[in-house]
């Protein structure tokens, strides 16, 4: 196991254009991790081919699409609201039962257990687009070849590396939370449940094994793949393509990418998020669709959420600028 967090000097000397120090010295992960990650990535594409073949000439069952949409929304909001805005950044305070429900829903998205996910994301904010960032598209520099390699690394390649993020440093609060630790330990079972439920519901609704299998394909494997690639696109595309209306820290190239706003539940307003990481709303400008923020607002009105960090108009106005903020402080929540 390798923890590749660079010395302070390397981070301070980074010029924002060159490859990260040690970028080519990334040992591969162990065989078991590579195998599991490859299976999670490849199997949904096989499922897509099988599902298209099975539906050829007769179309996709409406129940399969409805189940896929329901599971996509539930698990997606579990990641965006639970893993990200609540547990990583503390954008609001949730009732204990809601914390657990959101953590369970996020775990069913097949993106890693809650402790690892939060630790990696806090590390990403601490070292955004500079040495130490676990999935920056600028890892191999800003030239064309380096940028293409970096996009592949940020989107998916980093999952195959042996670059561990220490939970004890980046998520000690969750490590000490017994409920979150239990949810993390249950991650394999929750992944199994995420695929079993569509199968069982498809069987119950259609009354046939064929209906169960097609529901498993569309609402199980294919739904998982879509959510994963949308999340990974925020890591990769939302640091390269799009607009940067707000000031961020030095070297931070996070962008707003509107085509992904709905599918990502507002996560693709990434520049707004990196400008104000603890804000419960990522779409900081008028007209920016942010379903996750809308759901948090509903939780607040129901009394399930409190201490919500909503945008401060005066502060947002001050953050609007063309130049990045020169700030090298190492704050894991930013």
Feature-to-residue mapping (PLM):
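Helix-loop boundary elements of multi-pass alpha-helical membrane proteins
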Residues: 91, 240-245
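Membrane-interface module
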Residues: 112-116, 256-258, 265, 275
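Active-site-proximal inter-transmembrane loops
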Residues: 171-179, 243-269
């Amino acid at each position: 196991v390798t923890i590749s967090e660079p010395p302070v000097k390397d981070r301070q000397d980074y010029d924002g254009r060159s490859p990260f120090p040690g970028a080519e010295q990334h040992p591969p992960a162990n065989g078991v991790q590579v195998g599991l990650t490859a299976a999670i990535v490849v199997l949904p594409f096989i499922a897509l081919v099988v599902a298209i073949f099975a539906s050829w000439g007769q179309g996709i069952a409406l129940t399969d699409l409805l189940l896929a949409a329901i599971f996509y929304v539930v698990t997606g909001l579990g990641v965006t609201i639970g893993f990200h805005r609540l547990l990583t950044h503390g954008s609001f305070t949730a009732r204990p039962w809601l914390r657990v429900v959101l953590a369970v829903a996020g775990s069913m998205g097949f993106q890693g257990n809650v402790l690892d996910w939060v630790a990696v994301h806090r590390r990403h904010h601490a070292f955004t687009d500079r040495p130490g960032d676990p999935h920056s598209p600028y890892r191999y520099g800003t030239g064309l070849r380096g940028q293409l390699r970096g996009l592949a690394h940020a989107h998916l390649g980093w999952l195959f590396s042996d670059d561990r993020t220490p939970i004890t440093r980046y998520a000690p609060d969750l490590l000490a939370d017994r409920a979150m630790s239990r949810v993390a330990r249950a991650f394999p079972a929750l992944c199994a449940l995420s695929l079993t439920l569509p199968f069982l519901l498809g069987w119950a609704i259609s009354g046939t094994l064929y209906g169960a299998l097609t529901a498993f394909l569309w609402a199980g494997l294919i739904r998982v793949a879509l959510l994963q690639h949308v999340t990974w696109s925020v890591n990769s595309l939302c640091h390269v393509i799009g607009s940067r209306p707000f000031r961020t820290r030095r070297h931070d190239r996070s962008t707003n990418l509107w085509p992904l706003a709905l599918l990502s539940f507002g996560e693709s307003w990434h520049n707004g998020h990196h400008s104000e990481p603890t804000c419960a709303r990522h779409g900081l400008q008028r007209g920016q669709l942010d379903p996750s923020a809308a759901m948090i607002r509903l939780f607040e009105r129901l009394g399930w959420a409190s201490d919500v960090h909503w945008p401060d108009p005066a502060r947002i106005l001050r953050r609007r600028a063309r130049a990045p903020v020169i700030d090298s402080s190492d704050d894991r929540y930013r």
